[in-house]
């Protein structure tokens, strides 16, 4: 009888026992997984924290706070384009310029003075800068220069003797500057360009070109000349004098009034347009030329 009662009680209670829902089973599994890896995850996090802390400490240790003196030094170095030119600097360094086998290129770098040049320099191109003055010291130790180009600067003063030691100089361009007068030119020039300046006739000495027996190309257009320069050498082939204030010429300007047989056969081009002169009023001034000047004849 007792056995039967126990069996009945068992049958009554079995339906009341239900398995845990799936979500609870999953949470138990996840919890078990987390428990199994808890120690490993804690170690990993602790290692990363120590690594980052160490890295931060290292970075903090290597930070150098500059003082006011060092900051000023850095500022001075940053704004100084060229070092001071030394008297005995035998091989100066081209800083803002490019130096290639005797040629120095300093174009559009905003320099306001001629930079130090290597002694072997033969060609200097310093166009479109802010140079205001040329001095004798600029080229005193550069005897092999053959070409100088200062087109497009602000040059208004050229010191006496600036080109006196440049016995090999063949081409000189001072175009597009602020010149009021011409300097003494070196004797071997073949090309001289001083167009687009403010040069008046009184700024050119009477014998400025007389001894330049190799001068072939002369460009003085777009200035303020009142007359054609005197004593132009026989070597000239091209003379540009257009857009000045030239109002008259004489029979001796290009020819020789006392020698009707004289022929100036080397001149190929004379430009006088843009001047107030009427060329047709001076027919004897061109009698020695093979080609008439370009300009107004009426």
From Swiss-Prot:
Q: Which UniProt keywords apply?
A: Disulfide bond, Extracellular matrix, Glycoprotein, Growth factor, Leucine-rich repeat, Proteoglycan, Repeat, Secreted, Signal
Q: Return the protein name.
A: Mimecan
Q: Which residues form the signal peptide?
A: 1-20
LRR repeat boundaries on the chain: 112-131, 132-155, 156-179, 180-199, 200-225, 226-246, 247-277
Q: What is its main location?
A: secreted
SUPFAM superfamilies cross-referenced by the UniProt entry: L domain-like
The protein's matches in InterPro entries, at most eight in alphabetical order, are given as: Leu-rich_rpt, Leu-rich_rpt_typical-subtyp, LRR_dom_sf, Mimecan/Epiphycan/Opticin
Kindly list the GO molecular function terms attached to this UniProt entry.
growth factor activity
Does the keyword section mention Chloroplast?
Answer: no
Q: Which GO terms describe its cellular component?
A: extracellular matrix; extracellular space
Q: What does this protein do?
A: Induces bone formation in conjunction with TGF-beta-1 or TGF-beta-2.
Q: Which Gene3D superfamilies match?
A: Ribonuclease Inhibitor (3.80.10.10)
UniProt GO BP: articular cartilage development; bone development
Highest taxon of the lineage: Eukaryota
Where it sits in the cell: the answer is: Secreted, Extracellular space, Extracellular matrix
């Amino acid at each position: 009888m007792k056995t039967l009662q126990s069996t009945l009680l068992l049958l009554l209670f079995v339906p009341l026992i239900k398995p845990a829902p799936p979500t609870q089973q999953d949470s138990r599994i996840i919890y078990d997984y987390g428990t199994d890896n808890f120690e490993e995850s804690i170690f990993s996090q602790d290692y990363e924290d120590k690594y980052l802390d160490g890295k931060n400490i290292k970075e903090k240790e290597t930070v150098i706070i500059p003082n006011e003196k060092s900051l000023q030094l850095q500022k001075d170095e940053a704004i100084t384009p060229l070092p001071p030119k030394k008297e005995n600097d035998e091989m100066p360094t081209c800083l803002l310029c490019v130096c290639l086998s005797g040629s120095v290129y300093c174009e559009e770098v905003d320099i306001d003075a001629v930079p130090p040049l290597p002694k072997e320099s033969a060609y200097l191109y310093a166009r479109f800068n802010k140079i205001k003055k040329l001095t004798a010291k600029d080229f005193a130790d550069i005897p092999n220069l053959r070409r100088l180009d200062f087109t497009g600067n602000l040059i208004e003063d050229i010191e006496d003797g600036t080109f006196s030691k440049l016995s090999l100089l063949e081409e000189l361009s001072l175009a597009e500057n602020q010149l009021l007068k011409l300097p003494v030119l070196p004797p071997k020039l073949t090309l001289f360009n001083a167009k687009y300046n403010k040069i008046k006739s009184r700024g050119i000495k009477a014998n400025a070109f007389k001894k330049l027996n190799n001068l072939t190309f002369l460009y003085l257009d777009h200035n303020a000349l009142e007359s054609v320069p005197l004593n132009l050498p026989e070597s000239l082939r091209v003379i540009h004098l257009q857009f000045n204030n030239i109002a008259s010429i004489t029979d001796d300007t290009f020819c020789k009034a006392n020698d009707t047989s004289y022929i100036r056969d080397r001149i190929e081009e004379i430009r006088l347009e843009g001047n107030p002169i009427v060329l047709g009023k001076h027919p004897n001034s061109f009698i020695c030329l093979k080609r008439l000047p370009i300009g107004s004849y009426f």
